[in-house]
Regions:
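Bacterial Sec-dependent N-terminal signal peptides
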Residues: 1-26
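N-terminal periplasmic/intermembrane-space "pro-region" immediately following the signal or transit peptide
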Residues: 22-96
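Outer membrane beta-barrel
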Residues: 75-104, 114-228, 242, 247, ...
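Sequence/structural signature of outer-membrane beta-barrel proteins
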Residues: 95, 138, 152-156, 181-183, ...
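Transmembrane beta-barrel architecture of outer membranes
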Residues: 162-164, 204-206, 243-249, 259, ...
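Detector for outer-membrane/organellar transmembrane beta-barrel domains
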Residues: 255-375
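Conserved small/polar residues in nucleotide/adenosyl-binding loops
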Residues: 431-438
Length: 443
């Protein structure tokens, strides 16, 4: 515990040191005042401001998503523009008094007792660096027309991996994107790419529809490509799925950067019972409440999720392959387990360029039908604590420091812990959030 308090004290002290430095910085770097430049390449500049507005209006709200691009290519009529952008991010990580077996801080991946004697670990990562192309336009019949593709280098061997590829118009979105059973604008800022262990986060090929039905009220519904991650079992095969996943939500916003959201998801998970040579299905479902609110210089974040058979949507539990699990003593049969995840966070803005946040999160897998008895070393509960400070040095550079502490508890009540310090430097486009803004401002 002493090491935790020392690390937290260092972060607070760092924030106190950085804050007064900003006043000096504005004198040294006057370019920080006012917006940065956008380079527009076009024979005709008519409509350029309108196109820039489309980019800003359709900005993705997640903290790790790139902001509006610096370079725009427009057509001669000024009706369409192609944006090219992204960022380069490098992170240094040091684990102590326990390690996590991944570049992301995932409590579920804290090694089992006796599996390693290593208690400290140093890593560096640049694989979350992102590039994107975004085509936007205002059309007479289709409204704002958006084509967006983005990717980073999280593929096998740090190869390029697609993160988004979708088309959007008139409220419809089709393609590959983050799922609808999540609230990107309510996610807290972290250097850690995965984020809180109890947060919902996933990507899927989908067709969705979202609409503002009245002032402050927004609804959405979709169909998503199913993917079932189950625990291997004798005489059971998990493969082809017969039904899409169906998510939906209702969201109410009462002010800029302040909203509450209630969502749900329904899924049918098919597996083959090879004992009886029969295809069977289990029903999974989840409910979620989330929100964010601004109170003076503070921004609050929170989310609570509960359901059955929704493991792949929860950050920590998605690593366990427990969407469906074997039913004890019954060959060829599977079951769905209850599970939950939640987090609560707070961000404070010291100045227009410096902000800090802290978040606590928890995820829990429950047992039924003697599952825990036959899986004593299986994950039961994970906890995740993060505190960080960010400094937007200029329009093109953001640096950050972060402390993380994680706990993993098994069904046999064996506990393990890990600690990590993250330091990051990230190049950013000119419209990257200032400290007094949050991702919630973008919805």
């Amino acid at each position: 515990m002493k090491s935790i308090f020392k690390s937290m004290s260092c972060l607070v002290l760092g924030a106190m040191i950085v804050t007064p430095m900003f006043a000096q910085q504005k004198k040294l770097y006057p370019e920080l005042e006012g917006p940065g430049p956008v380079v527009i390449i076009s024979k005709d500049k008519n409509g350029k401001e309108e196109l820039i507005n489309v980019f800003e209006e359709t900005q993705r709200p997640h903290f790790h998503d790139p902001r509006a691009p610096r370079f725009l290519l427009t057509d001669q009529q000024g009706k369409f523009a192609l944006g090219i952008g992204g960022y380069l991010k490098t992170t240094m990580e040091y684990d102590f008094n326990g390690i996590v077996d991944d570049v992301d801080f995932i409590p579920a991946l804290i090694p089992q007792p006796g599996s390693t004697s290593v208690r400290n670990q140093f890593q560096m990562d640049a694989s979350t660096s992102t590039i994107f192309l975004k085509l936007v336009g205002r059309t007479k019949h289709l409204g704002n027309f958006i084509v967006y593709t983005a990717g980073n280098f999280r593929g096998s061997g740090k190869t390029f991996e697609l993160q988004n590829a979708y088309l959007s118009f008139l409220g419809f979105t089709m393609g590959y994107d983050t799922g609808l059973f999540m609230d990107l604008a309510a996610a807290p800022p972290t250097i850690d790419f995965q984020g809180p262990d109890g947060m919902t986060f996933y990507r899927a090929t989908q067709l969705r529809y979202e609409a503002n039905v009245m002032k402050g009220l927004k609804v959405g519904v979709g169909v998503e490509m199913p993917s079932v991650d189950g625990t291997p079992a004798q005489d059971v095969r998990i493969g082809k799925q017969r039904m899409p996943d169906i998510p939906a939500y209702v969201q109410y916003s009462w002010a800029k950067a302040s909203h509450i959201r209630v969502g749900g998801i329904l899924r049918s998970m098919t597996y083959e019972d090879q004992v009886n040579n029969k295809a069977k299905s289990l029903t999974g479902w989840g409910i979620q409440a989330s929100g964010t609110a601004r109170l003076g210089g503070f921004q609050l974040y929170g989310q609570y999720t509960y359901g059955r058979g929704i493991a792949q949507y929860l950050n920590d539990i998605s690593n366990l392959n427990v969407d469906i699990v074997p039913l004890a003593d019954e060959s060829g049969r599977m079951q769905v387990l209850p599970m939950k995840g939640w987090y609560a966070g707070l961000q404070y803005n010291f100045s227009k360029r410096v902000f800090a946040s802290a978040t606590y999160s928890q995820s829990r897998l429950f047992t039924e039908d003697c599952y825990a008895h036959f899986n004593e070393t299986q994950y039961k509960k994970g906890q995740y604590l993060v505190a960080n400070v960010f400094w937007n040095v200029s329009h093109n550079l953001q640096v950050g420091a972060e402390y993380l502490h994680g706990w993993r508890e098994n069904f046999n009540d064996v506990n393990r812990e890990a600690n990590r310090i993250n330091l990051s430097a990230q190049s950013v486009s000119y419209t990257h959030l200032r400290a007094h803004e949050t991702c919630a401002d973008l919805v």
